Amino acid sequence: MENKSARAKVQAFGGFLTAMVIPNIGAFIAWGFITALFIPTGWLPNEHFAKIVGPMITYLLPVMIGSTGGHLVGGKRGAVMGGIGTIGVIVGAEIPMFLGSMIMGPLGGLVIKYVDKALEKRIPAGFEMVINNFSLGIAGMLLCLLGFEVIGPAVLIANTFVKECIEALVHAGYLPLLSVINEPAKVLFLNNAIDQGVYYPLGMQQASVNGKSIFFMVASNPGPGLGLLLAFTLFGKGMSKRSAPGAMIIHFLGGIHELYFPYVLMKPLTIIAMIAGGMSGTWMFNLLDGGLVAGPSPGSIFAYLALTPKGSFLATIAGVTVGTLVSFAITSLILKMEKTVETESEDEFAQSANAVKAMKQEGAFSLSRVKRIAFVCDAGMGSSAMGATTFRKRLEKAGLAIEVKHYAIENVPADADIVVTHASLEGRVKRVTDKPLILINNYIGDPKLDTLFNQLTAEHKH
């Protein structure tokens, strides 16, 4: 239980970091394109346009993250506080302050939240606007100074330490060893904590100097996942074999890596294939001096190629290809050694049916009254979006007017009638909603989704 609790806490932390970064990914990609095109080594070198690169990464992007983090904690006033506090850590720093913005944003939201709570019942009538504006201004000033004098220098020291440790791995040729951490963490849905918390800030820092960074590639390579799913397509059995082709296409082209996680959890030995694929891909990226100009989100092959700078396409394609081949070879060997026949047993379908039918018991609501279904995942962007789209289309074809949308765990709507989420996220989802849960292992081919669909169509026909 303690391990599950610790994992849930790390997932929640990663989800919070993601909620700060994901809404601003478009700005990061815009900066990446400007960098790839107009810096001296870019596709269309232009000294005039290249002047935009520095201010964007130094001021705009960190302030956007800080403002978003403040909004998550303290609403609109928190967003303002987060932006003010972030400027404090930016000024005087020699590096882009992404780690600092991820601290100052939520801290600013928290500070103004407590300030507003303390003043709430003490404001005389008619003075609300004056006191609210001045309280935010004074608190913002103090937070900005704190960031400038204390938090900024502390973050700079921590950032330098982490950067030097990872760069030491790079220079020693040990960078591929990061896959030993990355791959197991990813299948436990901790990928957001790693990407947004460590690699993205380091990658942006390196890209601002070199025009590209390998840090954007060490945990996002779509090759190993492609190799694993290809092996299941050819050598898997039962449901895993039938669902793998669709998952493979969406993973590689759509960039939703969560699709291969259930396959690894189902056959834990295949984590060896993922680690080996990740290590070999990273080794190839490093060998050929590969790198991307910004973080690929989602991590599809299209995003990889679009963010590959001039002169690095061979490294990108080679790293993805090698990761695919190694993962495919090892996964195929593991599946061929597997002697048990994997089929969907009647018990499994019975459990799926019972999970849905339980909602129809006395005291529970009727499925005929279901109007909104929420598909939920960590970030609310990738796997849940795909699952919601697929399920919504099935319902539309059946003529059912049921709203199906996707959400991050923290944003599950109060008026959702049913919540669908991955089984590994059950604990976190239960903490934010008491709605009936459908726990699945695959967002597009899970038997429980088929059972839910059949039950809904049967109920709505009556």
From Swiss-Prot:
Chain ranges of the PTS EIIB type-2 domain: 371-461
Active site: residue positions: 377
Entry keyword annotation includes Cell inner membrane: yes
Membrane-topology annotation of the record: Multi-pass membrane protein
Enzyme Commission number(s) of this protein: 2.7.1.197
Periplasmic compartment spans: 47-50, 157-165, 294-313
Classification via InterPro entries: PTS_EIIB-like_sf (IPR036095), PTS_EIIB_2 (IPR013011), PTS_EIIB_2/3 (IPR003501), PTS_EIIB_mannitol (IPR029503), PTS_EIIC (IPR003352), PTS_EIIC_2 (IPR013014), PTS_IIC_mtl (IPR004718), Sugar_PTS (IPR050893)
GO terms for MF: kinase activity; protein-N(PI)-phosphohistidine-mannitol phosphotransferase system transmembrane transporter activity; protein-phosphocysteine-sugar phosphotransferase activity
Superkingdom of origin organism: Bacteria
Keywords (A to Z) from UniProt: Cell inner membrane, Cell membrane, Kinase, Membrane, Phosphoprotein, Phosphotransferase system, Sugar transport, Transferase, Transmembrane, Transmembrane helix, Transport
Residues recorded as bearing Phosphocysteine in the entry: 377
Primary localization class, coarse: membrane
Pfam families in the record: PTS_EIIC, PTS_IIB
Key word Cell membrane present: yes
Protein's cellular compartments: Cell inner membrane
Record-level GO cellular component terms: plasma membrane
Primary role: The phosphoenolpyruvate-dependent sugar phosphotransferase system (sugar PTS), a major carbohydrate active transport system, catalyzes the phosphorylation of incoming sugar substrates concomitantly with their translocation across the cell membrane. The enzyme II CmtAB PTS system is involved in D-mannitol transport.
Protein name according to UniProt: PTS system mannitol-specific cryptic EIICB component
Gene name of this polypeptide: cmtA
